[in-house]
């Protein structure tokens, strides 16, 4: 007996690359991918790569939110204090370019599971260039507002709220649980 099952798919367009991705209902294929015991980081990477390989960290978070919603782990809409939040309003808020004293600092997005010891370590390792030249910058000697740069680089997703955007994948998942 040959069963040709067609699993439902949800189509989403990735905000950075404008690539259309099909979000699947989790099934036996995904169980087989995750059945071997691995770390949560590695399991998530395998799962997301099976859906769409080579995504940026912000796109991984975006696909993860829609994967959770489509598989019934979080709600797609939620009303809190008279304001309705909708999963389709989630957007990428990551900033990778900053201005200071006439210079433009360009950063790469940190890897999805990349770890750093300190904020200055993160900024130093993610710095691509200043203006058009590669430079070593000691971020400890810069003003304290570079901490906000680190937060803007590391925060990938946001959703509009009545009192300003709610940022971070953890906060957004918590909102829709």
Swiss-Prot record:
Pfam families: Phage_hub_GP28. InterPro entries: Phage_T4_Gp28 (IPR024342). It comes from the Viruses. Keywords: Late protein, Viral release from host cell, Viral tail assembly. GO terms for biological process: viral tail assembly. The keyword Lyase does not apply. The gp27 and gp28 proteins seem to combine to form a small hub precursor during morphogenesis. Baseplate hub assembly chaperone involved in the tail assembly. This is Baseplate hub assembly protein gp28.
């Amino acid at each position: 007996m040959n069963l040709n099952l067609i699993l439902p798919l949800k189509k989403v367009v990735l905000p950075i690359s404008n690539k259309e991705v099909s979000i699947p209902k989790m099934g036996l294929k995904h169980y087989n991918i995750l059945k071997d015991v691995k770390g949560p980081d590695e399991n998530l990477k395998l799962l997301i790569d099976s859906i769409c390989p080579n995504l940026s960290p912000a796109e991984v978070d975006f696909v993860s939110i829609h994967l959770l919603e489509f598989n019934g782990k979080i709600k797609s809409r939620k009303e809190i204090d008279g304001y309705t939040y909708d999963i389709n309003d989630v957007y990428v808020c990551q900033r990778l370019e900053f201005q200071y004293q006439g210079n433009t600092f360009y950063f790469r997005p940190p890897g999805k599971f990349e770890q750093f010891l300190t904020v200055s370590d993160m900024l130093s390792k993610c710095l691509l260039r200043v203006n058009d030249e590669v430079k070593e910058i000691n971020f400890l000697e810069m003003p304290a507002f570079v901490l906000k740069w680190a937060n803007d680089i590391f925060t990938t997703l946001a959703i509009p709220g009545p009192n300003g955007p709610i940022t971070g994948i953890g906060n957004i998942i918590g909102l829709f649980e």
